[in-house]
């Protein structure tokens, strides 16, 4: 058992080495950048043609996607700064808080991606049994941009799954059970 593990089990604090902090901060900054990219693509996504105008704000799923990406970007920035600025050793409460917030952000972003993916799917393929036709025949570029934004959101979701694994490993392997 190395010194880091002994510190965590013997007391209520955990030493994070520079590499751990750097990797986690890079993952969080990457999540922030991808969230902002997905958010900006969706916000700028609007089209107007003979069939009418369409914007992300016309669809609740896309409004939720924008909100979730905004929350994720803000949390990613704040948590990256917190990880780098936290004094060593960090307390059990801080580790638990990061774990909990990472879980919440993971599920919020995953839900936003899933509901938006369903909306994009319906826009591309419609629903023939209830006579919904494809909207992408009329609003092609809107659908393509929405799909790109959803892909960015799922990549963010994957990064947050990785961050959740890191924070859960840190919490459950280095601290005694409550």
Swiss-Prot record:
Keyword Translocase: no
Main location as per UniProt: membrane
Pfam family, one: CASP_dom
Cytoplasmic side: 1-22, 91-96, 167-178
Keywords assigned by UniProt, alphabetized: Cell membrane, Membrane, Transmembrane, Transmembrane helix
GO terms classed as biological process: floral organ abscission
Keyword Transmembrane helix appears in the UniProt entry: yes
Localization per record: Cell membrane
Topological region Extracellular: 44-69, 118-145
Positions of transmembrane segments: 23-43, 70-90, 97-117, 146-166
Bilayer disposition of the protein: Multi-pass membrane protein
One GO location term (cellular component): plasma membrane
Domain of life: Eukaryota
Quaternary data: Homodimer and heterodimers.
PANTHER family linked to this entry: CASP-LIKE PROTEIN 2A1, CASP-LIKE PROTEIN 4A4
UniProt similarity note: Belongs to the Casparian strip membrane proteins (CASP) family.
UniProt protein name: CASP-like protein 2A2
